[in-house]
UniProtKB/Swiss-Prot annotation:
<feature type="signal peptide">
    <location>
        <begin position="1"/>
        <end position="25"/>
    </location>
</feature>
<dbReference type="InterPro" id="IPR044859">
    <property type="entry name" value="Allene_oxi_cyc_Dirigent"/>
</dbReference>
<keyword id="KW-0052">Apoplast</keyword>
<feature type="disulfide bond">
    <location>
        <begin position="36"/>
        <end position="182"/>
    </location>
</feature>
<keyword id="KW-0325">Glycoprotein</keyword>
<dbReference type="Pfam" id="PF03018">
    <property type="entry name" value="Dirigent"/>
</dbReference>
<feature type="glycosylation site" description="N-linked (GlcNAc...) asparagine">
    <location>
        <position position="119"/>
    </location>
</feature>
<dbReference type="InterPro" id="IPR004265">
    <property type="entry name" value="Dirigent"/>
</dbReference>
<protein>
    <recommendedName>
        <fullName>Dirigent protein 13</fullName>
    </recommendedName>
</protein>
<keyword id="KW-0732">Signal</keyword>
<feature type="glycosylation site" description="N-linked (GlcNAc...) asparagine">
    <location>
        <position position="55"/>
    </location>
</feature>
<comment type="subunit">
    <text>Homodimer.</text>
</comment>
<keyword id="KW-0964">Secreted</keyword>
<keyword id="KW-1015">Disulfide bond</keyword>
<comment type="function">
    <text>Dirigent proteins impart stereoselectivity on the phenoxy radical-coupling reaction, yielding optically active lignans from two molecules of coniferyl alcohol in the biosynthesis of lignans, flavonolignans, and alkaloids and thus plays a central role in plant secondary metabolism.</text>
</comment>
<comment type="similarity">
    <text>Belongs to the plant dirigent protein family.</text>
</comment>
<dbReference type="GO" id="GO:0009699">
    <property type="term" value="P:phenylpropanoid biosynthetic process"/>
</dbReference>
Amino acid sequence: MANQIYIISLIFLSVLLYQSTTVLSFRQPFNLAKPCKRFVFYLHNVAYDGDNTDNATSAAIVNPLGLGDFSFGKFVIMDNPVTMDQNMLSEQVARVQGFFFYHGKTKYDTWLSWSVVFNSTQHKGALNIMGENAFMEPTRDLPVVGGTGDFVMTRGIATFMTDLVEGSKYFRVKMDIKLYECYY
């Protein structure tokens, strides 16, 4: 009986090892010089200020905790329009839906989780971006960690550049998204 369990276990491990080496041997290495897809978009954020209910695209659902001068603890949800140019009234190609929160006690820093949801005839699905957003820096690189639809299991880098800030009410971010692992 013990010998039979040993043989079955050995066969199972052999099949498992064979499958894993087969999958790994067909993986294509990333070519960082040439992404398989690239998008340049503009995200437009209009913060809710108590009066602009119809125009707001983001709102704080948890206000700062008062632990410093850098909005520590503030949690913001958003549903922002995305356009191909800097004009917020241009045709929307996608929406960024998700949240970010301020987690820096000694400087302005946010951590975000966003889905770039495409609503065009050219692309269907969403890209998922998450990570540290040191938004006081001129450019920030965040990982594209997956997606749905046309972007299922994709990976890449989203470079954010703050394009315009109008006080605490409006900001625009240029997003340069390069995908290095594409399946569709």
